[in-house]
Amino acid sequence: MTRYNLCMANQAYLSIWLKDFPEDLMLENFGKFLETVPFSAKRPGFTYLEIRALEPSESPVFEQDLRAMPLDAASIVELSKDHLNRDSRYAVRANWDLWVFEGDPAKWQQLPQPIELVCNGELYDEGIWKEDGHFEVNFGFEHLFTGHGGLLGIRQIARPAQSPEEAQFLESMAKPANLQMYQEKTRENIKSLFAWTRKIEEALPVAKLRLWSEGEENFEARMEEILAAH
């Protein structure tokens, strides 16, 4: 059982805007975006594809569960070709490896964690790309990069536990050796996120990037603070 993410549903994201996004290059750029994914060693490949037209309330025009036979980026692009349109949204799911504190008894393990990647056509949902980006990444749980209860970073601003499970976790972090390990594993996760972000910048004609999360006022600055705290 996951010991310390039961009550922490906040997610972490990356929004990406390209310098130009013509329809005839949409899927080509989507493919380049997908090729940057650092797949989980145990669960490589894309496990789901969904294509919607016009707006979120519309039923998918294409939907396929790929868990039985995960696909690579080129295969996802091939499946999407018949539905190329600037009014469409393309979403895929996959897994990447992050350090998590799980098990019974709980211990640090590098395990597959779900991610979602999205391509927003410029006419989809009244131009939602202007707010969310041409491409989006949902990295998963925010706390895998920021920690719990304000424990990590230079400031270490303590916050009260939000559940008995989190209280138990925070109590265990009162031991210096446990807190040190927590810092190290969280920094490893942050480095993985930043490395992937740099890879995206190198693969695409990026105009702007925004790292953000549901629980942090400045997600990128928070991660940089944790990296700087030694």
What positions do the PLM features span?
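Intrinsically disordered, low-complexity boundary segments flanking structured domains
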Residues: M1-R3, Y124-D125
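Acidic, proline/glycine-rich low-complexity IDRs
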Residues: T2-R3, E131, E136-H230
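Ordered hydrophobic segments in well-structured contexts
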Residues: Q11-S15, V100, E116, H134-N138, ...
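Short, intrinsically disordered low-complexity segments
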Residues: T36-E122, P176-Q180
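Short edge beta-strands and adjacent turn/loop segments
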Residues: V118-D132
